[in-house]
Amino acid sequence: MGRLKKLKKIRIHREGTHILWGSFFLLLIINLALYWGIDCKIPFYLVALVSIVVYLLMVNFFRCPIRLFGQDTEKIVVAPADGKIVVIEEVDEHEYFHDRRIMVSIFMSILNVHANWYPVDGVVKKVTHDNGKFMKAWLPKASTENERSMIVIETPEGVEVMARQIAGAMARRIVTYAEPGEECYIDEHLGFIKFGSRVDVYLPLGTEICVSMGQLTTGNQTVIAKLK
């Protein structure tokens, strides 16, 4: 019941709503000006077509779809984002764990939905936000030098999993809904990142990885790992 109740809280990111309305009126004004301002209608039709395509892409980008994971969530780690697996490797994590972890990174292109989901059920232990650079999100240094938010979750089995939202070259805003001490669930939105970006998930050594490099992921649907 807790999971389903909290699902109702988030539909569309409010900043996305403002941008969509602003873009709609701007494109409408541009197209009306072209329609009434020139005799030849060919430029109007071309601009109108481009406007429709651009606006539909923006609507797709700012969606926060509600998806239900149809399996048992015990020890399951799901993809926190739509995108592509760009990193699967052991790394030294220095911000929180201070030990070796398996990092799985999902890169989100500008065409992907940029809503983020919690990768595991549990309790939020820590949330931090760091301002940083805006390098291309697929670069290795982006994990530690770009604008980023860190969310640490303790699962019901006592395993700590970290999700890190990372801004990309075009992104200038990371939104995180997580609050320390609150319960969180698979199926629930974790946050939102504007434009090209990525999400890293840090897992204990020995975790069974269920994805491969280059694999496409669907947020809250693709199982990326199984905890021991």
Swiss-Prot record:
Pathway: Phospholipid metabolism; phosphatidylethanolamine biosynthesis; phosphatidylethanolamine from CDP-diacylglycerol: step 2/2
Family statement drawn from the similarity comment of this UniProt entry: Belongs to the phosphatidylserine decarboxylase family. PSD-A subfamily.
GO biological process terms on file: phosphatidylethanolamine biosynthetic process
PANTHER family named in the record: ARCHAETIDYLSERINE DECARBOXYLASE PROENZYME-RELATED
Record-annotated active site: S197 (schiff-base intermediate with substrate)
Membrane topology: Peripheral membrane protein
Cofactor binding summary note: Binds 1 pyruvoyl group covalently per subunit.
Post-translational modification: Is synthesized initially as an inactive proenzyme. Formation of the active enzyme involves a self-maturation process in which the active site pyruvoyl group is generated from an internal serine residue via an autocatalytic post-translational modification. Two non-identical subunits are generated from the proenzyme in this reaction, and the pyruvate is formed at the N-terminus of the alpha chain, which is derived from the carboxyl end of the proenzyme.
MF (Gene Ontology): phosphatidylserine decarboxylase activity
Compartmental location: Cell membrane
GO cellular component, one term: plasma membrane
Cofactor(s) essential for the protein: pyruvate
Name of the molecule in the record: Phosphatidylserine decarboxylase proenzyme
